């Protein structure tokens, strides 16, 4: 019985966090596509608030330009009563992202900047995920 109580105590403090993102290899300008946000269980309270979506040149040095998302193409609210989507405790959720009609065709990094708050200390920040996409006519 003690083991069950301990397990439930830890489980109640666990929360999901976004740990990766994926998208189709080819996307069409002026059209929406579905990007996938993948989540896992985290041992502390963890809130992902939203994702800023961007397209950047494929040669963007993300180590030298920490926090850069390139051209902002969208935002997805993940928090509260008016969230655009609900991130599951562990799994995947699809998010609609639209490529601007005036985006030049070519290869880009699709970058997702996910804002978060974690733990009792209230640490905030962003996690960044990227994948290469080909923008087509």
Curated annotation (Swiss-Prot):
Name the domain of life.
Eukaryota
Keywords from the named record: Glycoprotein, Host cytoplasm, Secreted, Signal, Virulence
Q: Where is this region: BAK1/SERK3-binding?
A: 107-136
**Where is it localised?**
Secreted; Host cytoplasm
Coiled-coil intervals = none
Residues modified by carbohydrate are 38, 61, 130
Give the family per the record: Belongs to the NIS1 effector family.
Protein's recorded name: Necrosis-inducing secreted protein 1
Species name for this entry? Answer: Pyricularia oryzae (strain 70-15 / ATCC MYA-4617 / FGSC 8958)
């Amino acid at each position: 019985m003690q083991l069950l109580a301990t397990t439930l105590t830890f489980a109640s403090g666990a929360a999901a966090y976004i740990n990766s993102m994926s998208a189709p290899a080819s996307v069409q300008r002026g059209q929406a596509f579905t990007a996938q946000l993948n989540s896992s269980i985290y041992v502390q309270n963890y809130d992902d608030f939203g994702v800023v979506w961007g397209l950047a040149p494929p040669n963007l040095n993300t180590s030298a330009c920490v926090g850069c998302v390139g051209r902002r193409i969208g935002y997805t609210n993940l928090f509260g009563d008016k969230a655009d989507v609900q991130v599951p405790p562990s799994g995947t959720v699809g998010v609609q992202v639209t490529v601007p009609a005036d985006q030049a065709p070519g290869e880009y990094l699709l970058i997702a900047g996910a804002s978060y708050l974690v733990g009792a200390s209230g640490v905030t920040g962003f996690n960044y995920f990227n994948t290469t996409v080909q923008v087509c006519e």
